Amino acid sequence: MTLKNKTILVTGSEGFTGKVLLSLLKNNGAKVFSTGLSQKVDKFYYQCDLANEKCVINMIEEINPDEIYHLAGSFSNDFYIDLESNLITTRNILESVYKLRKKSRILLIGSSAEYGSIKHGDNPISELHSLNPTSMYGLTKIFQTYLMKLYVELHGLDVVMARVFNLNGKGISDKLFIGNLYKQIKDLKSNKIKEILLGNINNERDYISVNNAVIAYIKIMKNGITGEIYNVGSGKPEKIECVLNQILKEEEISKNVVKTNCKPNMKYDVKTIFANINKLKKLG
C-alpha cells in the first residue's frame, strides 16, 4: 500500500483510533493533516471546531485534501451532544466540500448501533438489515447515514461509510466496555478502587482490533463504491466474558475482584450481534 502524493485530512485525530490511522497513513507516504480542539503548534494540525461551518470551510480550502477521514464524533447518548458531534460536524464537512467544489473522497464512520434491536436469527447482520436504534447515539448515526446519501444523490459527492461494530484495544474510550474495563484495572492497580464492577458479561458481540478496523477504513476509502456502506467487524460473535478473561490474564488481575451484573440491564439489551462482512471482503 502506497499513499504517496496523497493529501489526507483526519478528524478525531486525537482519539485512539485516529492516532492509529494517522500513524498508518504517514508510514505509507501520505501527507496527513489532522484537526482537533486542542492547541498545539504543528503545521500539519488545525485547531477547528467542526460544528463551526466557517472554520471547516477555511480549513478544507487551505488543505485541499484528496481524502477526508471523518472519525470525530461522540456517543454520550445525550441527544444534543451527539446530534452536534455526529450530524452537524458531518454536514459541515459535506457542505464545505460541496460549496468549494472539491473532489475530496470522504469516509464517514457509522455504527452497529444503527441496527439496534435485532433477533438472534438475523445474524450475521448485513448492511441491508433494517435500522432499529435503541439509543440516541444510534439514532444520530442513522441521521448521518441519510445525510451521506442525500449529498451523494443531490450533489454528487464522493462519500463512503464504514459501519463499525465493537472496537478492541487498549486506549479506547472508557465509555465503551473495554475502555471502561481498562480504566477500572488502572484504578485497581493504583488502589483507587477495591473491585471491578461490570454489567452483563454473557452477551456476545463482534469485536475487531483497532488496527484491523483502521486497515478496513483505508480499504474502503481506496476501493469502496460511492454512496455504499460497509460493515467493519470480525464477522464472528465473541462472548463478552471471554474478552474479559483475556484482558484480566494479560493484566495479571484475578477474576475474584470482578463483580458482574452491577449495572442495570438495558431494556433493549441485545444478546448476540455480529456482522456479515462479505461486502467488505469483496474489496480485496
Question: Where are these predicted regions, by residue range?
Answer:
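Conserved Rossmann-fold NAD(P)-dependent oxidoreductase catalytic core, especially the SDR/UDP-sugar
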Residues: 70, 92-135
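Rossmann-fold cofactor-recognition segment
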Residues: 39-52
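Active-site helix of classical SDR
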Residues: 136-143
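C-terminal "lid/loop" region of Rossmann-like NAD(P)-dependent oxidoreductases
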Residues: 196, 200, 229-230, 238-245, ...
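NAD(P)H-binding glycine-rich loop region in Rossmannoid oxidoreductase-like domains
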Residues: 50-86
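N-terminal Rossmann NAD(P)H-binding glycine-rich loop of SDR-like oxidoreductase domains
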Residues: 8-27
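SDR active-site strand-loop-helix element
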Residues: 11, 35, 68-72, 106-112, ...
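NAD(P)-dependent short-chain dehydrogenase/reductase
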Residues: 118-120, 146-205, 210-218, 237, ...
